[in-house]
Amino acid sequence: MFSLQEICRKNIYFLPDWLSEHVIQRLGLYWEKHGSLQRIGDDYVLIQQDLIIPINEALRMAGEEGNDEVVQLLLLWEGNIHYAIIGALESDHYSLIRKLYDQIEDCHDILPLIQDPKIFEKCHELDKFCNILCLVLHAVKNDMLCILQEYKMHLSGEDIQVVFETACRSQKNDIVSWMGQNIAIYNSGVIFDIAFDKMNVSLLSIGYTLLFNHHINNTNENINSLLTQHLEWAAGMGLLHFMLETLKYGGDVTIIVLSEAVKYDHRKILDYFLRRKNLYQEDLEELLLLAIRADCSKKTLNLLLSYLNYSINNIRKKILQCVKEYETTVIIKILWKRKINLIEPILADFIGYHSYTYMVDFMREFSIHPEKMIKMAARESREDLIIKFSKKVCKEPKDRLHYLKSLVYTMRHKEGKQLLIYTIHNLYKACHLESKEMFNLARFYARHNAVIQFKSICHDLSKLNINIKNLLLECLGIAIKKNYFQLIKTIETDMRYE
């Protein structure tokens, strides 16, 4: 029945003083032996205009008394039904318990609210499909050690293992300690795995206490191996406090352990132990190379370099190999600021296979002049980069042509010079030059023994009906002076037709 009275009971927050006790009882707002009930906000009730208590505490009291009418009123006021069940369990009001329990889905939701172990067990028994293991697991999760102590003999070895792991994962340290000291556990080492997983150093400490003080069967070799493994894990996870806790029981921070800290860029761990250990130069160098491969931060690289006094002569080639293989330039920049230049050796490798966009960023980062980039691109047969970098310097084709010509004069690499001349000639083909400019370009080709390009431009001049006899004579003189025999032969052949 959802009557007007029910609506009033649910929403009334104020009882006038002049209402008699009889009227209050008829409204259903009276609690026998306690007095009138009045809702205060959403979470409290006022009893007999005098005592204010939380609505859930009132529900527990009503459940304990078995007062179904008051329970229903308080539930109407949005109290938590779990507290009514707890109260009913305290006084064994099973008719009320059954009525209320039918309205909830799972007794396990109530367990965290219970402090009394006996009530805890009673509540768990409401679910007829649960077993002792289920009870103990929930007891562990809710710090009910006494229940575990009572039922430990009813658990199999496999059950004990499950309970122990649950205690570890729930980080119930007192229960973990008690189990380790009083119950035979098949795989007690799981405590360490969970300690690292939960990053709980207290659990790690308990594990070591159990390992060393309660005679777990491990040989010294196994223990040493275990401690080393834990140091490596902690270093890789950046857990310095785990490392310090482990070192209380043995182990050593070796180069392998520090390598884990380097791999995951845990500079604070490195700093702590490098200050306290005198590592060999070779070990520091290996750590630095590993840091480069792992793309560690500038701070980590600087830290390792500082312990090497920025001396990299022994590993110069290895650094360059790492930079090339892992495409990282952080170390190059750090050393460059310390006046140690590794840009020249790496530039050729980078320009050989990186994109223009990447190389532009590289050029800006290290303040490299475009002229150097173009010459290196020529050495590495990257005509695409020659074109793009020259466009960056000179937007106009004619200006670009003159700029590239100027680079040829200072280019020593033979194949690189030939590629520059080839690029210049392609640029010439794409832009319109005056005859005077074409004559200058022909002389340029002659000076640099560019036979094919010289022959091509002379052919273009002839097609324009321009007399090139004097040009050929001038260029012949250049060729004879420089002993360019093939060019001499080409010019002499052309002169027969002029």
UniProtKB/Swiss-Prot annotation:
Induction: Expressed in the early phase of the viral replicative cycle. The keyword Transcription regulation does not apply. InterPro entries: MGF_505. It holds the Pfam family DUF249. Plays a role in virus cell tropism, and may be required for efficient virus replication in macrophages. Belongs to the asfivirus MGF 505 family. This is Protein MGF 505-5R.
